[in-house]
Amino acid sequence: MKNLLFITWDGPQTSYMEGLFMPIFQEIAKTSDVKFHVLQFTWADENKISETKSAADKMGITYSALSILRKPNVSVGSLLTVLTSSNKIKNYIQENNIDVVMPRSTFPAMIVNKIKNRHFKIIFDADGLPIEERIDFSGLQKDSFQYKLMKSAETKMLKNADAVITRSQKAIGVHINNIGNENRNKFSVVFNGRDKNLFKLNSNSRVEARKELGLENEFLFVYAGSLGTQYCFPEMLEIFKNHTKANNSKFLILTGNTEFAEQKIPNELKSSVILKSVKSDEVPYYLNAGDAAFALRQPSFSMQGVAPIKLGEYLLCGLPVIASKGIGDTGDILKNFEECYLYDHSIGLQSQSKLIINFLEKAIFADKSRIADKAKDYFSLEAAADSYIKILNII
């Protein structure tokens, strides 16, 4: 049996660990002789940590949390945590006979880089293009000490790791440009998977959810996820507004940030928009009420490395999707989904409004079961697990 240690660095507001990674690890363990350990660096409170540990226990995963210092300020506290954690990780590796270490993203990579005389294999989860994402959305400057420190650590890990996993082929291209083509063979793309028994086409859920929402024959747009400047809320509202001019339509928004949505929705659309904040396991129920979904995101440089989780959730539920061009490998994947529309941000909405109207007219007749079946090849837990297993088998 291989003992694999996954090291991650997460804020308290994220649920990637219990919602994405641990279900994939559980699925891998069903068919592979691998025991998963998780060390999560976090500043979450005891309740959140307890919830995550409980989820891990149920999935047969050994979970521990390590605190991230937040004083004297966030940046210095994070650096101090990195500088003082390598011995803790080294001890854990020795005490638990760890064979493979999988650091996810920059800070865990920095910690593992500091371990000398290693006797374990490394699979580096490069996690998209996280440093470039900080440049695009958090104001990180390329000439700053922080950027140079993180980029140096990432480059060292990319070169030293036995294998590197990304979420897109485009991300591999970016990394190869950085470290050289001789390292290409160590790179692989892994999928983000969802439980196809939860995210699935369900006619009963559709009837019940539409009744609960007070819908009859209305065409229902749906969006599930975060809201903010990078998630193209104005474009969603404009597409919806255009559709209401000639159709009886509503827009269901499932988000934890309902306050943001309330502030941005124009008065003339408020009566046609339904805002809800629901638990993650309730999302598929409401998605089944929909007729088309939005998966829009600003296609900045860093977004080449992203695999949109929501896109998979929509497609597994059989929904036609309006998705952004230039986000990870979305364009290549959606070549197999003629029931979806690739939104080109470079030409703006007005230039493609007629194409979108035509797409939406056809969407109501889409074969949802066919969409859901095709989606399993890319977005199911089984597909995600298989993509990891291929790497574990050759490491």
Features from the language model and the residues they span:
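N-terminal subdomain of nucleotide-sugar transferases
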Residues: 1-53, 57-59, 96, 238-246
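A short helix/loop element that forms part of the nucleotide-sugar donor recognition site in Leloir-type
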Residues: 51-55, 200-214
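Nucleotide-sugar-dependent
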Residues: 231, 277, 281-286, 293-313, ...
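Nucleotide-activated donor-binding/catalytic signature segment of Leloir-type glycosyltransferases, i.e.
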Residues: 255, 261-285, 292
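Membrane-proximal helix-turn-helix segments that form the acceptor-binding/catalytic region
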Residues: 86-91, 110-114, 124, 130-131, ...
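A charged, aromatic-enriched C-terminal amphipathic alpha-helix characteristic of glycosyltransferases
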Residues: 344-351, 361-393
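Carbohydrate-associated surface elements
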Residues: 170, 193
